[in-house]
Amino acid sequence: MRAELYEAIKAKIAEAVPEIKHIDLWNHNVEFLEEETPWARPAVFIEYGTITWQPLQGHGRRGRGEVRIHLVTDWAEGQYEAAFALSRKLLQAIEGLSGDEFDGMALMATDTSHSHEDILENIDTYAVRYYLSEP
């Protein structure tokens, strides 16, 4: 289900927000900019939060979790409006996204990180419901 969600988010962003130049899984990417292989910006990193599971009667499990979308753009004085507009385009693209093993993607929270000198990081947190069939 996480792989399906990741691929669905990636495909939807590539289709609806072509300005995004790099999409990957989150691994504290912005904390080690000088140490990592450079990636093109604007970039999106997808982070999974904890999923809590409840059994369904005899046919799988239903889960609830969070997915955080990290939008990373270059920082330039007065350019925050473009980053916020790009964040809005991402919301319009992935709000309500669904698949065979997930649905109900809904924006819950938005944060802006001011902890970096050369980049701006906007983080949107979405609620998502998962379905896991029994093996």
Predicted regions and their residues:
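A solvent-exposed, acidic/Ser-Thr-rich amphipathic alpha-helical stretch
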Residues: 42
